[in-house]
């Protein structure tokens, strides 16, 4: 029962990425105002802890399934007891909420997201129609959280919307890849309900993300360097999903899902460029 097992329980890399997203979101919103660094550090720690809470909860609720499908995970392998996992998850969220009190709006959002994470783990993992939207919201919300921490959410709302639609699209594509297993597990998902038409739904959501990505330039938040960067990303989005539209397949879905994840990170870089070279 070493610290490595607890890092595995919270999915350390995911927590670090979410924390980094909040920090970058705050940097963008503050236009690299280094006087806000303390607030950004607090926000990043809160996101790390609340994300860890959500990931630990997922393992707690998935114990029966993981005993069969992922017996190497910390709880089914008995490297961490179920009781200790629960205590640890509560400790994470309690600490995160306490730290979030540095900003009352951050505290309220941390409470909201903690409740959403709990509901997702306990109720909506088998209803992916709702669960996909929850995952997309949580992914994008880290940027707004960073913006709240520095007192400016204008730009981060746009980043949130781009991330939400891109991740929502990606989750549907991932479900298309997993459709056979989801049918066996009696999961509700858009691909199960709509079949190949779900690919067109995912593509439409991705088009929304592409259209929204131009808003920071159109509203005057960022300049031409941002526009050039984000148009490049938008082209990669469309190129990445086009083969799946022509020939829907599980392998194509896997490739498209990977491409969307990579390009979403590049969009974040475009926002950084736009903020720095405003």
Swiss-Prot record:
This protein's superkingdom?
Archaea
Give the transmembrane region(s): 17-37, 40-60, 91-111, 129-149, 153-173, 204-224, 226-246, 257-277
Named in its record, the pathway it takes part in is:
Membrane lipid metabolism; glycerophospholipid metabolism
Q: What GO cellular component is one of the record's annotations?
A: plasma membrane
Task: Provide a GO biological process annotation.
Answer: glycerophospholipid biosynthetic process
**Which compartments does it reside in?**
Cell membrane
Keyword annotations: Cell membrane, Lipid biosynthesis, Lipid metabolism, Magnesium, Membrane, Phospholipid biosynthesis, Phospholipid metabolism, Transferase, Transmembrane, Transmembrane helix
Q: How does the UniProt record describe the way this protein sits in the membrane?
A: Multi-pass membrane protein
Question: What is its EC class?
Answer: transferase
Output the Pfam families linked to this UniProt entry.
UbiA
Q: What is its EC number?
A: 2.5.1.42
UniProt cross-references to InterPro entries, sorted A to Z:
DGGGP_synth, Prenyltransferase_related, UbiA_prenyltransferase, UbiA_sf
Q: Which Gene3D superfamilies match?
A: UbiA prenyltransferase
Q: Which reaction does it catalyse?
A: sn-3-O-(geranylgeranyl)glycerol 1-phosphate + (2E,6E,10E)-geranylgeranyl diphosphate = 2,3-bis-O-(geranylgeranyl)-sn-glycerol 1-phosphate + diphosphate
Cofactors named for this entry? Mg(2+)
The terms under GO molecular function for this entry are: geranylgeranylglycerol-phosphate geranylgeranyltransferase activity; magnesium ion binding
- Principal location listed in the UniProt entry: membrane
UniProt function note:
Prenyltransferase that catalyzes the transfer of the geranylgeranyl moiety of geranylgeranyl diphosphate (GGPP) to the C2 hydroxyl of (S)-3-O-geranylgeranylglyceryl phosphate (GGGP). This reaction is the second ether-bond-formation step in the biosynthesis of archaeal membrane lipids.
The entry sums up its family as follows: Belongs to the UbiA prenyltransferase family. DGGGP synthase subfamily.
Protein's name according to its UniProt entry: Digeranylgeranylglyceryl phosphate synthase
Tell me which species this is from.
Methanococcus maripaludis (strain C5 / ATCC BAA-1333)
Q: What is the lineage of its organism?
A: Archaea, Methanobacteriati, Methanobacteriota, Methanomada group, Methanococci
